[in-house]
Amino acid sequence: MTKIAAETLPDAHFSMTWGPANFGFSAEKIAPFVPYIKQHNFHHYLLNDPAIIALLRKIQTEKGLVTSIYECSTNIRELLHTYFRLHPWNARINHFDCLGFYTFTQTNWGRPGASDWKRTLQGAITYRSDDHCIPSIRMYALMQGVTDIRYWDALLPYQNDPETAAFLKTAPAKVLRDKHDPEQPDRFRAEAVKLLKKLTK
């Protein structure tokens, strides 16, 4: 079906969300779809599979294909640091083009708790209020992570500087490796600021 659709509508942008392994997705099952799908959205749990990582790297070398990573926990007690703030770090280190969550905002679908601040039935990071969205603390933690990456980006033009190059070679990986330490991203920012001050004098 996917092959027929892609051949019938060659200019269409087909995307696929590859859920966690318990949905039965594996590198072997995903690979046949690669020639026909323009955007591949991977659940973050899939990155624990070396075969998926190898396939992901192959997809990322193909011109015109987009890769993204998403999370979708419905647990209101997910750790703000490891689950939300580090989500952008995980996306950047794994070379994804974009990141997301299964649901951005909870909506009034008649379900109990659909707009209840005490529940997040589909892993949403904002709440709906009439025609507006109200950010949750989860959204603010995600924004912290996005800002962390902006500090990283600010250093990229200075990679010819040996100190900056050495920092960028090890520091980002350390943030994810030591994810039990919520102060790691703040230390990264502080060091990035020091380097930027020195480099932009």
Segments from the language model and where they lie:
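Catalytic domains of carbohydrate-active enzymes that cleave complex glycans
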Residues: M1-A31, R111-K201
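Catalytic-core regions of glycoside hydrolase
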Residues: M1-P112
